[in-house]
């Protein structure tokens, strides 16, 4: 049994600080954790993204159709017959890239967006000292104009990755922060419409493939459901429905206990609308960029995602087969059936010898 290793990079960027003044005439910053129900919060989020309902519905319909048209079906009995591609079994080293708006502060890590709304965290202190400077209306949205990527050169990155000996490259398409690092037709908050105003993911995909490397991507959209929940407990812009399309529902996270993230005990509110949106966004990524690897974080194992995950896996495997390649899905912990995809250990490794290939990233 071979172990695959994926090295993770977290990139920071510096920027000057410029903010626009809020013109809100009411108090949209007031805490909402105790004053709004989960259903009301979810309704506000749905309304904020309603203009994309047509494209979302199209993508979901496409996923459902392709999921039932090919060698796989959207059920675990079928998906457990999955076979990894030989190139992936033979690969020893890959590059995983964390890079996004959260790089602007050049502090903490990619969980900065969550922790900047939690008063006990260093990111909260950093943001208020260096960016907000006493203005409660400032939030993560105000870091986006500072993320310009003016020195980003995909060809140079790809050349360095090639010289490092990596066989595959997996940049984050969207992290928990909800900002799409790709050209999404389902959001206003994208790297094409704001900040750099260019499709950095698309540029990197082209450059990586030009170097003869395999291209994948990661999606952390599932976790966005709760990521900004700290902002609902304090005065912050997370409470303003005007920004619900960026901050998402920000439902209170009832985290499962235990080091293994036993998600069967996770009681966080997840609506059908959210899992449908998740399916649409990941379908969009596959159709636009044709990744050979799709990496998911642990929260796709939350019980409410089971049906959507099976639908996506069958869609992706069938789509890849129809386009001449074999797709790989990475998952963490116990969030997916071991036989249906490739298990990834973040900052860890398999504790015993098993027949299946697995991956570690650090």
Segments from the language model and where they lie:
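Bacterial N-terminal signal peptides
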Residues: 6-16
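Mature catalytic domains of secreted/periplasmic carbohydrate-active enzymes
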Residues: 21-362
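Positively charged n-region of N-terminal signal peptides that target proteins for export
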Residues: 1-4
């Amino acid at each position: 049994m071979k172990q695959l290793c994926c090295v993770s990079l977290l990139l920071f960027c510096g920027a000057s600080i410029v903010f626009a003044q809020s013109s809100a005439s009411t108090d949209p910053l007031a805490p909402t954790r105790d004053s709004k129900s989960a259903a009301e919060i979810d309704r506000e989020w749905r309304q904020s993204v309603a203009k994309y309902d047509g494209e979302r519905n199209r993508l979901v319909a496409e996923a459902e159709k392709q999921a039932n048209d090919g060698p796989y079906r959207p059920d675990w009995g079928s998906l457990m017959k999955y076979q990894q591609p030989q190139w992936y079994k033979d690969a020893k080293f890959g590059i995983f890239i964390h890079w996004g708006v959260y790089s602007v502060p050049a502090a903490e890590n990619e969980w900065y967006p969550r922790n900047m709304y939690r008063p006990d965290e260093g990111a909260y202190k950093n943001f208020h000292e260096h960016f907000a400077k006493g203005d409660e209306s400032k939030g993560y949205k105000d870091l986006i104009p500072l993320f310009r990527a003016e020195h980003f050169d995909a060809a140079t990155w790809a050349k360095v990755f090639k010289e490092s000996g990596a066989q595959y490259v997996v940049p984050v398409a969207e992290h928990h922060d909800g900002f799409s690092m790709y050209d999404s037709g389902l959001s206003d908050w994208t790297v094409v419409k704001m900040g750099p105003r260019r499709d950095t993911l698309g540029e990197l995909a082209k450059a990586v493939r030009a170097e003869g490397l395999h291209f994948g991507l990661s999606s952390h959209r599932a976790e966005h459901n709760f990521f900004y929940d700290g902002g609902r407990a304090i005065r912050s812009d997370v409470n303003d429905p005007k920004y619900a399309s960026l901050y998402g529902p920000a439902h209170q996270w009832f985290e499962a206990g235990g080091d293994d993230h036993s998600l069967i005990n996770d009681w966080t509110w997840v609506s059908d609308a959210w899992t449908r949106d998740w399916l649409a966004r990941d379908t969009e990524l596959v159709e636009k960029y044709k990744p050979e690897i799709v990496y998911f974080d642990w929260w796709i194992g939350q019980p409410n995602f089971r049906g959507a995950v099976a639908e996506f896996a069958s869609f992706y495997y069938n789509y890849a087969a129809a386009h001449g390649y074999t797709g790989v899905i990475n998952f963490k912990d116990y969030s997916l059936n071991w036989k249906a995809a490739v298990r990834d250990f973040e900052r860890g490794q398999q504790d015993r010898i098993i027949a299946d290939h697995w991956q570690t990233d650090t």
